[in-house]
Regions:
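Glycine-rich SAM-binding Motif I of class I
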Residues: 358-362
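Gly/Ala-rich phosphate-binding loop of Rossmann-like dinucleotide-binding domains
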Residues: 365-366
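A positional/structural detector of protein chain ends, strongest at the extreme C-terminus
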Residues: 1-4, 506-508
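Glycine-centered helix-boundary capping/hinge motifs
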Residues: 342-343, 369, 400
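Domain-level detector for long C-terminal conserved domains
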Residues: 381-508
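S-adenosyl-L-methionine
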Residues: 2-345
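Conserved class I S-adenosyl-L-methionine
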Residues: 346-356
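Conserved SAM-binding motif I beta-strand of class I
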Residues: 371-376
Length: 508
């Protein structure tokens, strides 16, 4: 009974509470703020166009750059009412966040998931620039390193021979057209940041073949971030109508705008050539003393894809348990070893004992600019190394870069007099001795007696006996070497995805 009487009392109080409904009835007022964002589009639109206005009076390329920029603006393919709606949406987005500093990707039109991936590319562009700045600040710059190849900017070498992408990935190689192209429309050409010939590609797809679309976009991005100042790169990197953005948009799987892609690439070629002819790129290279690791890796991959990859089966014919086992240390590992840990400079000497197809020898010559030696005794690997070296010199000229001297020797390094002479001058020696027999490792220790004091030896097996072993009393390695054990992470070697140990020994 008390509960019932209590309930009755509550019913008498409730009715006035229900009348609070009045508040919800009078809430049509909030729509009034809608006009506020509409007042900002003119502000964001002027902000969007201002970088282009800053560019024309700034760049040393003068009229060539300003005219190229205007060409890029006037060539947006297929204008339509849908484009106007998208631009209106973009202006509204910018208005909503005008008071905040935005990331390069924040104002972009979203088409689908692929567009999100494209925006990741823009983030990559900025991250590479930040990485390059951070790298240059964290390491000592080799002021003696001269990156520029003067020959690349003097005149076009009509006799320059290199392997075009079309020579390994084309309709003739049973690839199929992409982006809805007919067989007559697949051909494209790409300008490098020098006066040299353009590379020929075909817009085709084939398993394990060069991807012309991806390669084109990466090359444009690398040129913009390495060879040009921010102002000079504006026609390339502009978020709305830059060459990179237009190429990514046109190649989007849901758009597949062949003519738009080719138009953007054609304008990129013309704009870059104008900058090269006006001396802008050459001047910028004069001010650089170190090569970004990701650019070096890309160039080396270009070489490998055109020389080794088509014949890679030749490297699988060697037996485990012998000194004739093939394996590669990958680009990030070599950068860590030569740039970060041993801090090599362009006036030093590098030697790779068992150099395979020459990957590390070429990377040292390109990324460090040092004198670089290698010796290999497997015939197939030697043949591929020679092919890589030939393409290496041509590619360096295309990119306008001057590498260090490259010397690739054939035969047993224990019996090669040129290698023995190079070892006496060496500052860093690499020995991928993971699969070497114990006899060969013992022979190497005796060779190290001729190394100069302070020379660094990088190996995957230690040349010093275990300190717990009773056999280290007369061990030559422990007498002449001080050893540091290190660990490399996943993805640093070709034969396994797992990490492992390596050793840096210093000649006493």
């Amino acid at each position: 009974m008390p509960l019932l009487s209590g309930k009755g009392n509550k019913f008498k109080v409730d009715p006035p509470k229900i009348r609070i409904e009045k508040v919800t009835i009078e809430r049509p007022a909030p729509p009034k703020p809608k006009p506020k964002p509409a007042a900002r589009p003119s502000l964001s639109s002027s902000a969007r166009s201002s970088p282009a206005r800053r560019l024309s009076p700034k760049a040393s390329s003068g009229s060539a750059l300003s005219s190229a920029s205007s060409r890029a603006k006037s060539s947006s393919p297929y204008p339509s009412s849908a484009d106007e709606r998208r631009l209106d949406l973009q202006r509204k987005r910018k208005a909503l966040s005008a008071s905040q500093r935005r990331s390069p990707a924040s104002d972009r039109i979203e088409f689908d998931k692929d567009s999100d991936a494209e925006d990741d590319g823009w983030m990559d562009l900025d991250s590479h620039k930040r990485q390059r700045k951070a790298t240059s600040e964290s390491k000592s710059v080799d002021s003696n390193r001269k990156l520029k190849s003067a020959k690349a900017f003097e005149r076009k070498d009509e006799r320059l021979q290199f392997i075009h992408a079309v020579d390994v990935a084309s309709l003739e190689h049973k690839c199929v057209p992409i982006m809805g192209a007919s067989k007559e429309d697949v051909a494209i050409e790409l300008q490098y940041p020098t006066l040299q010939r353009r590379e020929k590609f075909e817009l085709v797809w084939g398993k394990d073949k060069i991807d012309a679309v991806e390669a084109s976009i990466r090359i444009v991005r690398l040129v913009a971030e390495t060879y040009l100042t921010d102002a000079e790169a504006e026609p390339f990197t502009n978020q709305n109508n830059g060459f990179i953005r237009r190429l990514e948009k046109a190649s989007n799987r849901n758009i597949q705008d062949l003519m738009g892609f080719k138009a953007a690439l054609r304008e990129y070629n013309e704009t870059l050539l104008a900058l090269v002819e006006d001396g802008v790129v050459s001047k910028n290279l004069d001010n650089l003393h170190d090569l970004p690791p990701h650019l070096a890796a890309f160039i080396l991959d270009q070489i490998y894809d055109r020389t080794v990859a088509p014949k890679v089966e030749l490297l699988s014919k060697y037996e485990n348990g012998t000194d004739y086992v093939y394996g590669e240390l990958l680009h990030p590992f070599i950068t860590k070893l030569l740039v970060e840990q041993t801090k090599m400079t362009s006036d030093q000497v590098f030697v790779d004992l068992g150099s395979g197809v020459g990957n590390v020898v070429l990377q040292a010559a390109l990324e460090i600019g040092c004198e670089s030696w290698g010796c290999e005794m497997m015939e197939n690997a030697c043949n591929l190394a020679e092919a890589q070296e030939k393409e290496f010199h041509a590619r360096c000229l295309l990119w306008g870069l001057e590498p260090g001297e490259v010397h690739l020797e054939r035969g047993d390094f224990r019996k090669n007099s040129s290698i023995h002479d190079a070892l006496k001058r060496a500052d860093v020696v690499l020995v991928n001795n993971k699969a070497f027999t114990s006899q060969l490792n013992e022979d190497l220790i005796r060779m190290f007696l001729d190394l100069k004091s302070g020379c660094k030896i990088i190996s995957l097996k230690s040349f010093v006996a275990d300190s717990k072993s009773s056999h280290n009393i007369n061990d030559v390695g422990s007498t002449i070497l001080e050893v540091e054990e290190c660990t490399y992470p996943e993805g640093y070697v070709s034969w396994t995805n797992a990490g492992g140990q390596y050793y840096i020994s210093t000649r006493k």
